[in-house]
């Protein structure tokens, strides 16, 4: 599976995604109220209430997340909480440029920015 596609959207199963990304850590940034685009995130399984959209990039119809190495692109824009994300094997995942979306994600933990260890911030610092 190549992540270099720019004009096409790759779609894969959660099981294949997990196999290909074994050992990769995924995150989502959240607002204080845990609501983003009218969806309220909770610990545990989160399933989008909008029909999953595999046709359009950066669109409704999917719950977005990114890998740790791309966190520097998003941390300033989406609130002051960091959620650790896992993907269920029965999910559908779209691979977009620098991010992913899925019809369902599992939030394992939610941490306020003030409580996130310094090593995380050092690790995600953009290296140009």
Regions found by a protein language model. Give the residues of each.
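Active-site-proximal loop/hinge segments that shape catalytic or ion-binding/gating pockets
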Residues: 111-128
